[in-house]
């Protein structure tokens, strides 16, 4: 579908490409030392479907169709601009390739093709909180990177402190979590005491392609130490959900639920 509700490709180009160029020009003019940029994992989607760790320096591509195409094209162009400014003006660059970064926010929705939908993991958590059945689609042993925001922030801080020229770094743990482990963990952490959601296996339904990121470079060059495994992330997420420490900034969950 070429025309979608709420979808404007110019916004991606203007905010990501032109926006990055504006930042780089500002850095050049004030003689700042470095830029830290978040890159979409869509540039390595062509390597998904395997448990072989994906190198941070893999060939960058972009999906030819779908609502992430223009976004990914714009992100790749921004990375190319950053590399130009590094080589032309010696502006250090730390480009962080991000999978989904899991973080509590009272708004559990996002937009697909301009339409508001539940974020998948938030929908599952909500069902577990209410003791409802959870489904596992496709291969229950398919793995993916699960990264908690507090590990991501550690990497950003390492980039700020680093004296290196930088490069492209994967954000992850280098360890995949299976779909079954994801669902079991959500049940363990979020189901009410004395209640346990049942699991329905749906192998006929489509799952997401598995992937694991190679974080060796992130560890060795930046000194990154992953602190949150899957279960500790869920437990901390639950604490943040209950405390709502940033409610004056973000609002509360009742402000967003339909």
Question: How would you describe each model-predicted region?
Answer:
Residues 36-40, 97-99, 172:
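Active-site beta-alpha turn of Rossmann-fold NAD(P)-dependent dehydrogenases/reductases
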Residues 70, 74-77:
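Active-site helix of classical SDR
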């Amino acid at each position: 579908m070429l025309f979608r509700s709420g979808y404007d490709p110019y916004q991606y180009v203007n905010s990501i490409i032109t926006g990055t160029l504006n930042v780089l020009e500002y850095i050049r003019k004030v003689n700042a030392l470095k830029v830290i940029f978040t890159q979409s994992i869509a540039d390595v989607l062509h390597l998904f479907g395997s448990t072989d760790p994906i190198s941070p320096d893999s060939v960058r591509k972009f999906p030819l169709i779908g609502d992430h195409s223009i976004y990914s094209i714009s992100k790749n162009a921004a990375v190319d601009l950053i590399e130009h400014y590094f080589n032309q003006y010696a502006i250090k660059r730390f480009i962080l390739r991000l999978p989904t970064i899991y973080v509590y926010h009272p708004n559990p929705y996002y937009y697909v093709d301009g339409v508001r939908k539940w974020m998948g993991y938030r929908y599952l958590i909500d069902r577990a909180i209410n003791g409802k059945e959870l489904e596992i689609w496709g291969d229950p042993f398919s793995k993916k990177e699960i990264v908690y925001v507090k590990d991501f922030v550690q990497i950003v801080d390492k980039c700020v402190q680093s004296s290196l020229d930088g490069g492209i770094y994967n954000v992850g743990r280098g360890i995949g979590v299976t779909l079954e482990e994801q669902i079991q963990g959500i049940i363990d952490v979020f189901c009410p005491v004395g209640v346990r959601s049942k699991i329905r296996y749906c192998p006929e339904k489509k799952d997401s392609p598995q992937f694991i990121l190679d974080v060796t470079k992130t560890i060795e060059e930046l000194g990154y130490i992953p602190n949150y495994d899957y279960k500790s992330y869920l437990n901390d997420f639950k604490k943040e959900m209950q405390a709502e420490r940033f409610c004056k900034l973000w609002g509360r969950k009742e402000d967003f639920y339909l």
